[in-house]
């Protein structure tokens, strides 16, 4: 186990990045503005109710379009405000324009010498009715712009701490790239395996812990523990519907025990099972 607080790539990122928070000023005292010891400077505590925040919020919208636009899942600007910036807090890392590509500077409308901070990652989680539980709405990263892999994972760990979240629930596509990032936080409780309520029914609803020890481990880059798989589920409609029916019986907790595995006859996910006490 590493003795250092952050993995080497994350330490390098913090040499040229600063954390930011977007939330109304009246909410700041309820947030952890030093997540895992990384202080959010006063200049990057952005109040979305102020005219002065307009340019930075435009950059966040453009960042989201860069990461989710190709999947037709980019958020309209009003969704950021209604679902993220007012009821919760948006967190991420920002860097100077000189550290990003000329193409991205053109997208953001900044010059290489501009003394501004432009966002390159973001994390959004929305509080649920259960105290301490948040629903993960968005994790976006352009970490490749500064040559850092896994910066979305680091941003998520810090963002969960900003919100003081105890547990995190979210939705992800079984074949999506983000699934590997979520598994860095440990085995994922599978709350739904096939989700007709979502635009993409082959979506799982997952849950994992976000206690300080878990977030510190992720930030160090240490591997999570993984339970043994009881069986593997084929990631097609029939396989996922069968698992969904088992979930709905309510007598067993199923968890995703690792990344899906490609076989000759399709893609399969390892599933752990734990009988629930009546």
What label would you give each PLM region?
Residues 2-86, 94, 219-236:
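Short amphipathic alpha-helix that is part of the acyltransferase structural core
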Residues 164, 174-196:
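Conserved active-site alpha-helix within GNAT-family acetyltransferase domains
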Residues 44-141, 259-260:
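A conserved beta-strand-loop-helix scaffold within acyl/acetyltransferase catalytic domains
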Residues 133-134, 161-175:
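Conserved GNAT acetyl-CoA-binding A-motif
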Residues 138-162, 184:
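Conserved acetyl-CoA-binding loop-helix of GNAT-fold acetyltransferases
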Residues 1-32, 195-278:
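Intrinsically disordered, low-complexity, positively biased terminal segments
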Residues 169-180, 234-237:
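Conserved beta-strand-loop-alpha-helix junction that forms the acyl-donor binding cleft
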Residues 119, 187-191, 253-256:
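Residue-level detector of beta-propeller blades
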